[in-house]
Design a protein with these regions (language model features):
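Dual-mode signal for accessory low-complexity, basic/Gly-rich regions
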Residues: 1-220
C-alpha cells in the first residue's frame, strides 16, 4: 500500500505465521480497543489478527506493520504554524520548536524499566514569536513519557506524513511504517544530544601493518 504517493514498508498480506493481515483499531478516541495479536493468546484475546511477525530464526510475537494515526481535530498546516506562534506568545516564550524530520527513536516499555521514549530529530527550527526568520537548531532530541506527552497535544495538521523504518523487539527487526499528521504540543521535553569526542589517531599504533614486505615474508 501507499499513502500520498509514498509506499509503506510495513505492508504485507500474510504475517510470519501464515495468518492473513487484518486492519486493527487499537485505540479509538483515547480508549484501548484491541491488541496486535500473533497466535499466542492473552487474556480476553484468544486469536491472531495477522500481526505475528519476526526476524528469521526468532519466535513471532505481536508487532506493528503500518501504524496509522488519524485525527478528528485537524487544521491546515499553515494554520498549525500560526497556532505554534500563538502558543509561544501565550506562554511568554520567545520561540517554539518545529521538528521537520526525524531519523527514528526508541521506547522503553518493559515493567522493569521506566516507561519512556526518545525521538531523534534530523531537522529542527526555532520559530520566533516576534516574526524573525526561523533559525536552524542542532543537537536536540525529544524525550518524555508517552502518557504525559499525549495529554499535551493541542491539535494536529490535516496532512498525513509517512515514516518508513525498521523496528526492533524480542522477535527481531522487521520493516514498519508510521503514518501520522503533524502535531502541536503545548509542551515537549527536549535534551541536548550527546556527541562523541573521539578523534582518529595522528600516528599508526605501534606494530601496525605498514604495508611493506621483504623477500623473506617478514614485515618490518
Amino acid at each position: 500500500g501507499e499513502i500520498n504517493g509514498t509506499k509503506l514498508a510495513g505492508a504485507y498480506e500474510f504475517d510470519n505465521e501464515g495468518t492473513p493481515a487484518e486492519r486493527v483499531v487499537v485505540i479509538q478516541e483515547g480508549v484501548l480497543k484491541n491488541f496486535l495479536m500473533s497466535r499466542m493468546p492473552i487474556k480476553g484475546f484468544d486469536k491472531s489478527n495477522g500481526h505475528g511477525r519476526n526476524q528469521p530464526g526468532l519466535m513471532p510475537t505481536g508487532r506493528q506493520g503500518n501504524l496509522i494515526v488519524t485525527s478528528s481535530q485537524a487544521v491546515p498546516e499553515k494554520q498549525l504554524r500560526q497556532m505554534l506562534i500563538d502558543e509561544a506568545k501565550k506562554q511568554g516564550k520567545p520561540y517554539g520548536l518545529y521538528f521537520d524530520d526525524i531519523q527514528g527513536g526508541f521506547t522503553l516499555t518493559t515493567r522493569s524499566l521506566p516507561q519512556a521514549f526518545q525521538v531523534l530529530p534530523v531537522i529542527v527550527y526555532k520559530v520566533y514569536a516576534d516574526g524573525r526568520p526561523d533559525e536552524l537548531v542542532r543537537g536536540v532530541d525529544i524525550v518524555g513519557t508517552p502518557l504525559a506527552a499525549l495529554t499535551r497535544i493541542i491539535t494536529t495538521g490535516d496532512t498525513q506524513h509517512v515514516f518508513n523504518g525498521v523496528c526492533g523487539a524480542e522477535s527481531g527487526s522487521v520493516p514498519v511504517s508510521a503514518v501520522a499528521p503533524a502535531m502541536l504540543f503545548s509542551e515537549m521535553e527536549v535534551q541536548k544530544r550527546a556527541h562523541g569526542r573521539e578523534r582518529p589517531p595522528i600516528l599508526p599504533a605501534p606494530g601496525a601493518d605498514s604495508g611493506k614486505d621483504d623477500s623473506t615474508g617478514v614485515k618490518p
